[in-house]
């Protein structure tokens, strides 16, 4: 285990802070400038549209009656804590994993603040084609998804290198 924060993945925590503030500032801008369901068309396939998400990704459990707010709060705190512990235990040189963990932490904490302050998450990024809309999302959601992809990518690369080295031993 690295001895100082400079030697550990915690050195990358600034990414989580940056994601958190970008997410919160963008949501505050939406709350100050949009009415619920109001849209601003930016491109023929892209709007800013203020919606409230009472659930998780893709509005999962959004109509569950309110208990999901506390479930998702516990999940966000739990994952953020776990990833912070893992950051502390790994080397600062593990670029992909440190970036992935801090993206997820920043996104989870950004959405956590919304849940605690408002009881819902502010979503506003709206991609569409004709009349078909992708579920609205926010900067925190984007960071969580990018972080998850990086974690999966790293797992596949780690598995491949272990397989390659195991095959090398067999020869």
UniProtKB/Swiss-Prot annotation:
InterPro entries: Peptidase_A8. This protein specifically catalyzes the removal of signal peptides from prolipoproteins. The chain crosses the membrane at residues 12-32, 67-87, 93-113, 137-157. Disulfide bonds: none annotated. GO terms for molecular function: aspartic-type endopeptidase activity. The active site is at residues 123, 141. The gene is lspA. This is Lipoprotein signal peptidase. It is found in: Cell inner membrane. GO terms for biological process: proteolysis. The keyword Heme does not apply. It is a multi-pass membrane protein.
């Amino acid at each position: 285990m690295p001895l100082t924060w400079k030697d550990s993945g915690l050195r990358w925590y600034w990414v989580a802070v940056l994601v958190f503030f970008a997410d919160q500032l963008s949501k505050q801008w939406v709350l100050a400038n949009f009415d619920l369901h109001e849209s601003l068309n930016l491109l023929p396939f892209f709007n800013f549209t203020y919606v409230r998400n009472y659930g998780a990704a893709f509005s999962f459990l959004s109509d569950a009656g309110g208990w999901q707010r506390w479930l998702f709060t516990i999940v966000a705190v739990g994952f953020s804590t776990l990833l912070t512990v893992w950051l502390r235990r790994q080397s600062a040189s593990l670029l992909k994993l440190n970036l992935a963990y801090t993206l997820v932490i920043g996104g989870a904490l950004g959405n956590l603040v919304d849940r605690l302050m408002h009881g819902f998450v502010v979503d506003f990024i709206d991609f569409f084609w004709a009349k078909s809309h992708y579920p609205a999302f926010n900067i925190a959601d984007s960071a969580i998804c990018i972080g998850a992809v990086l974690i999966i990518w790293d797992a596949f690369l780690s598995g491949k290198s272990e397989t390659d080295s195991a095959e090398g031993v067999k020869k």
